[in-house]
Amino acid sequence: MARGNQRELARQKNMKKTQEISKGKRKEDSLTASQRKQSSGGQKSESKMSAGPHLPLKAPRENPCFPLPAAGGSRYYLAYGSITPISAFVFVVFFSVFFPSFYEDFCCWI
C-alpha cells in the first residue's frame, strides 16, 4: 500500500514539473524556454567550430609493422622479446607434427 502512495506522489510531482516546463519557466534556473534554446544553440555552434580541421595521424617511427605495445605501457613491441600467441601456436604445431608424443604430453598441461 505504501508503494502505491509513493508512485502516486511521484506521478503528481512529475506532472507538476512537466507543466512548469511547458509554461516556459523552471524553478532551478529561472530561464524561459526561448532563452534556453538560444544558449544551447550557441553552445552547438561553438562545438561545430571547434570540430574544424585536425592534424592527420602519423604512423609510429620505429617498428611501423608492429604498433601494439606490450602490456604495462612499455615501449617493447609484441614481436620483439616476448612470446606472442602466434609464436606459441607455431611452436606447438611444429613439435606436434614432427614429434607426436610432444602433442600428447602437451595436451595434459592444458
From Swiss-Prot:
Changing residue 11 to E: Decreases SNCA binding. Residues 34-50 have a biased composition (Low complexity). InterPro entries: SERF-like_N, SERF1/2-like. Residues 1-30 have a biased composition (Basic and acidic residues). It comes from the Eukaryota. Changing residue 16 to E: Inhibits SNCA binding. Residues 1-61 are annotated as: Disordered. Isoform Long is predominantly expressed in heart, brain and skeletal muscle. Isoform Short and Isoform Long are expressed throughout the central nervous system, including spinal cord. GO terms for cellular component: cytosol; nucleus; protein-containing complex. Keywords: Cytoplasm, Nucleus. It is found in: Cytoplasm, Cytosol; Nucleus. Positive regulator of amyloid protein aggregation and proteotoxicity. Induces conformational changes in amyloid proteins, such as APP, HTT, and SNCA, driving them into compact formations preceding the formation of aggregates. This is Small EDRK-rich factor 1.
